[in-house]
Amino acid sequence: MDMFPLTWVFLALYFSRHQVRGQPDPPCGGRLNSKDAGYITSPGYPQDYPSHQNCEWIVYAPEPNQKIVLNFNPHFEIEKHDCKYDFIEIRDGDSESADLLGKHCGNIAPPTIISSGSMLYIKFTSDYARQGAGFSLRYEIFKTGSEDCSKNFTSPNGTIESPGFPEKYPHNLDCTFTILAKPKMEIILQFLIFDLEHDPLQVGEGDCKYDWLDIWDGIPHVGPLIGKYCGTKTPSELRSSTGILSLTFHTDMAVAKDGFSARYYLVHQEPLENFQCNVPLGMESGRIANEQISASSTYSDGRWTPQQSRLHGDDNGWTPNLDSNKEYLQVDLRFLTMLTAIATQGAISRETQNGYYVKSYKLEVSTNGEDWMVYRHGKNHKVFQANNDATEVVLNKLHAPLLTRFVRIRPQTWHSGIALRLELFGCRVTDAPCSNMLGMLSGLIADSQISASSTQEYLWSPSAARLVSSRSGWFPRIPQAQPGEEWLQVDLGTPKTVKGVIIQGARGGDSITAVEARAFVRKFKVSYSLNGKDWEYIQDPRTQQPKLFEGNMHYDTPDIRRFDPIPAQYVRVYPERWSPAGIGMRLEVLGCDWTDSKPTVETLGPTVKSEETTTPYPTEEEATECGENCSFEDDKDLQLPSGFNCNFDFLEEPCGWMYDHAKWLRTTWASSSSPNDRTFPDDRNFLRLQSDSQREGQYARLISPPVHLPRSPVCMEFQYQATGGRGVALQVVREASQESKLLWVIREDQGGEWKHGRIILPSYDMEYQIVFEGVIGKGRSGEIAIDDIRISTDVPLENCMEPISAFAGENFKVDIPEIHEREGYEDEIDDEYEVDWSNSSSATSGSGAPSTDKEKSWLYTLDPILITIIAMSSLGVLLGATCAGLLLYCTCSYSGLSSRSCTTLENYNFELYDGLKHKVKMNHQKCCSEA
């Protein structure tokens, strides 16, 4: 009885199965024209798809230049298991051999897919096992909107709006708006309304997935990206001086919003002839917007945010979540900017009235926000001394301007906790006369206008040599070529007045080994031409030879190198020395239209001076790349401070030397009554210290920028005059922290002629300064003059001691007349080089000149222990010399040596000076008596 119903069940299943098999499956696959939008679904969608499916579709566009876009329904369900059994596959073409765009399964719908050509191949496969709901997608022609919404703007002002504004913008837009400004014009962009699709999962600024607006400093995808914006937060005002500002607007297939409306203005920009690169960049004034300020973390109560870190802000400051030297405060300046000083301030809590401040910090800079350089002091990171209380403003001035976009402050030590407010000081590159960027960064110079002697691979071709905007750069075919053999050339399109270049290192490598190289050029030469055939080098006015420019010390940090205006359409840069990783370069050319240039004397360097002066050096990994193979040539590449070489010709030229203008008088050669043996133009100047017998005497110092030579000495040359007898003295001293050393001194009348002085600047682990001290005694009449101080690269060190009488021996007594009137000297030096901070209440710390304690004679710095050591050493040398003389006498007397057997070393008298032997030829005499 029980078997009968069971038999009927099996029979029913059998016949039903045969009935299903007898019905043919609905067809799937085929060729589809995307002229009219349509849908593709898995068989049976949204019900479970059948087993053993193998469907193929080819979707094509009616025109060969059209693309196809696919958008999937969120209800997506295909068996998982790593897409081995059931899957949908999309290929960029018309066959199974085309490039794979995606292979998908699971229950997460694929993102939007866009073809690169006019066809897409779609395949759906299922096996015999578990099934799901399948998929549904919409195909259509991809419309960029370029024909409807892309536009160039050249009028003095105008409005830029999203398509259809104030109605909701369309889907699938990819619009480009470009504002083009004439030379000497600044572009100001202000947003009035901004409403784009918001990403609820957005993590930080610029993290936009659906609809967004990109703003570019130049041509899109060529110039640097200023920012990516979405949601409802209105972008702050933008000011661009590169001549091109672009906006690209992207929308997807989903949500549409009201869009945006913005106005732009073109404002005439006339650079000042005698500008100072020390203006506040906008932290205190608000010109730097809140969106440009960020931090590694923020205190949890939300009352100490990065946006509260503005100098003199009355609402707390920035505090990280944890007090650690790994925390940082970051400012995005949006454009390349010259940074010359940083002012910091602590904060007092409004809730507890407790004071917090940073006592020291490190500085990091970057041009792209990813590759960072720590500001260094020699080989070590520079630690800036900051505040001593919560309200004082401390200003730290950089020795040389840093060209950067992103700035990070990393607190190192603090009181009670980290609290920081700050202001940044500097200027724009284009603030200097005839200093427009001529198109490498912005893209105004096309790829076809950039060429090179050779190229390593297409990834590092000349077109990749654009300043900042390229992440790689130009690499020649041979990374370690001969000096001057490789070159990078820029065609400016029309003749321009060229006044400088900005040079930057590069990132690249060997595609076979996949090892990234961080390369830069240490020294280079520049040539120019009007026709591309006849070339001339930029000349060094002192030697009338091709000028050897200092290059980079880090692969990411750019450096500006200026020269006298030249007419040129073609500019070439020849690498002469480079980093151990080889030659790598990015470039920009500075200048203006040929008719705009005027003969001016200017420099981009700031007039600020401080003890916070450091020359950037390579990072630790770069410094150790060559290991033990580092040669003496690499040591010579250490860059001296800007402004060390100085001829005092122009009042507008702020050489790095500090001096008392009331005592050192700048005098022209034509007006000088002093005799000289050379003829110079009327505008040549020199420094003169003068006194007559009726005066109380004169004492003046001329102080160099800080110098750091940890590995090799260099030769310093200068010209001098000293007249007036024994009451006149001129000496050169090396001054370091807690130490002074006399290097050179003359104290007798040198006659009326100009003479050459040469001194070896010794290698030294610490930073030091070179000080010229001129003294004219009380009741004495005389004159001291100095001119043309420079570092010589063509004088061998063994010839760098002139005159030889100026080099003191160990027991040399310096007869310097005593001077009592030094009051106010330090303040007078500071006034000449101080920044005008009259508009703020900043209290600067430090001084631009050494303290008066260091002005004392170097003899006073010797303590009794050191004197004892010197005395004992001298006694040992004397005993050794006596023994050596007795031994030589015995050898010559009893071995029958003739005078010809004596070594030739006895024909010379060697004198050690800072580790180098100076050789003076003596009269030939017999060393031994003849029997």
Curated annotation (Swiss-Prot):
<feature type="region of interest" description="Disordered">
    <location>
        <begin position="298"/>
        <end position="317"/>
    </location>
</feature>
<feature type="disulfide bond">
    <location>
        <begin position="208"/>
        <end position="230"/>
    </location>
</feature>
<feature type="compositionally biased region" description="Polar residues">
    <location>
        <begin position="298"/>
        <end position="310"/>
    </location>
</feature>
<feature type="domain" description="MAM">
    <location>
        <begin position="642"/>
        <end position="802"/>
    </location>
</feature>
<dbReference type="GO" id="GO:0038023">
    <property type="term" value="F:signaling receptor activity"/>
</dbReference>
<comment type="function">
    <text>(Microbial infection) Acts as a receptor for human cytomegalovirus pentamer-dependent entry in epithelial and endothelial cells.</text>
</comment>
<feature type="glycosylation site" description="N-linked (GlcNAc...) asparagine">
    <location>
        <position position="157"/>
    </location>
</feature>
<dbReference type="GO" id="GO:0099175">
    <property type="term" value="P:regulation of postsynapse organization"/>
</dbReference>
<feature type="binding site">
    <location>
        <position position="197"/>
    </location>
    <ligand>
        <name>Ca(2+)</name>
    </ligand>
</feature>
<dbReference type="InterPro" id="IPR022579">
    <property type="entry name" value="Neuropilin_C"/>
</dbReference>
<comment type="subunit">
    <text>Heterodimer with NRP1. Binds PLXNB1.</text>
</comment>
<dbReference type="GO" id="GO:0030424">
    <property type="term" value="C:axon"/>
</dbReference>
<keyword id="KW-0325">Glycoprotein</keyword>
<dbReference type="GO" id="GO:0045211">
    <property type="term" value="C:postsynaptic membrane"/>
</dbReference>
<feature type="glycosylation site" description="N-linked (GlcNAc...) asparagine">
    <location>
        <position position="839"/>
    </location>
</feature>
<dbReference type="GO" id="GO:1901166">
    <property type="term" value="P:neural crest cell migration involved in autonomic nervous system development"/>
</dbReference>
<dbReference type="Pfam" id="PF00629">
    <property type="entry name" value="MAM"/>
</dbReference>
<feature type="glycosylation site" description="N-linked (GlcNAc...) asparagine">
    <location>
        <position position="629"/>
    </location>
</feature>
<feature type="glycosylation site" description="N-linked (GlcNAc...) asparagine">
    <location>
        <position position="152"/>
    </location>
</feature>
<keyword id="KW-0524">Neurogenesis</keyword>
<feature type="binding site">
    <location>
        <position position="252"/>
    </location>
    <ligand>
        <name>Ca(2+)</name>
    </ligand>
</feature>
<keyword id="KW-0472">Membrane</keyword>
<dbReference type="GO" id="GO:0071526">
    <property type="term" value="P:semaphorin-plexin signaling pathway"/>
</dbReference>
<dbReference type="GO" id="GO:0097491">
    <property type="term" value="P:sympathetic neuron projection guidance"/>
</dbReference>
<keyword id="KW-0677">Repeat</keyword>
<keyword id="KW-0732">Signal</keyword>
<dbReference type="GO" id="GO:0021828">
    <property type="term" value="P:gonadotrophin-releasing hormone neuronal migration to the hypothalamus"/>
</dbReference>
<keyword id="KW-0812">Transmembrane</keyword>
<keyword id="KW-0106">Calcium</keyword>
<dbReference type="InterPro" id="IPR000421">
    <property type="entry name" value="FA58C"/>
</dbReference>
<feature type="transmembrane region" description="Helical">
    <location>
        <begin position="865"/>
        <end position="889"/>
    </location>
</feature>
<dbReference type="InterPro" id="IPR014648">
    <property type="entry name" value="Neuropilin"/>
</dbReference>
<dbReference type="GO" id="GO:0016020">
    <property type="term" value="C:membrane"/>
</dbReference>
<keyword id="KW-0945">Host-virus interaction</keyword>
<dbReference type="GO" id="GO:0019955">
    <property type="term" value="F:cytokine binding"/>
</dbReference>
<dbReference type="GO" id="GO:0005576">
    <property type="term" value="C:extracellular region"/>
</dbReference>
<dbReference type="GO" id="GO:0010595">
    <property type="term" value="P:positive regulation of endothelial cell migration"/>
</dbReference>
<dbReference type="InterPro" id="IPR000859">
    <property type="entry name" value="CUB_dom"/>
</dbReference>
<dbReference type="GO" id="GO:1903375">
    <property type="term" value="P:facioacoustic ganglion development"/>
</dbReference>
<dbReference type="GO" id="GO:0021785">
    <property type="term" value="P:branchiomotor neuron axon guidance"/>
</dbReference>
<dbReference type="Pfam" id="PF11980">
    <property type="entry name" value="DUF3481"/>
</dbReference>
<dbReference type="GO" id="GO:0007155">
    <property type="term" value="P:cell adhesion"/>
</dbReference>
